[in-house]
């Protein structure tokens, strides 16, 4: 799975695309949470792209792993353009509450950034890993 990270002023953005199995998203989202913790950022912006194989089970596992890291992000904005992914990330909104994470699914990156309060500056792109 391709998971490209961008460091935004107030969040880590991860683009999920070209996955083979739902489990592919788990290490990508865990790495994003780890990077956010290292950078002392409280927000994740997860953008569902072409070939995002997310399922409710995989997202649940990813949220559990983020919690196990000891410092889950305070807020996660999911951006989904296709109904199957929108449905999965809509489920994640309520499931994330179990871990004290506020989550919301959006249909545009701009709306997601507004919800997170991310300032609009040039992001820094980082390779995953």
Give the residues covered by each predicted segment:
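Amphipathic, Lys/Arg-enriched alpha-helical "gate/interface" segment within cytosolic domains
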Residues: 1-129
């Amino acid at each position: 799975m391709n998971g490209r990270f961008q460091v935004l002023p107030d969040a880590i953005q991860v683009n999920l695309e070209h996955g083979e199995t739902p489990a592919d998203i788990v290490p990508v989202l865990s790495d994003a949470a780890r990077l956010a913790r290292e950078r002392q950022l409280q927000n994740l912006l997860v953008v569902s792209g072409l070939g995002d194989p997310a399922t409710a089970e995989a997202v649940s596992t990813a949220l559990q792993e983020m919690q196990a890291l000891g410092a889950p992000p305070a807020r996660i904005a999911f951006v989904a353009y296709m109904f199957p992914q929108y449905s999965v990330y809509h489920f994640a909104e309520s499931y994330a509450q179990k871990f004290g994470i506020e989550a919301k699914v959006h249909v545009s990156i701009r709306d997601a950034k507004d919800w997170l309060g991310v300032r609009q500056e040039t992001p820094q792109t980082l390779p995953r890993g």
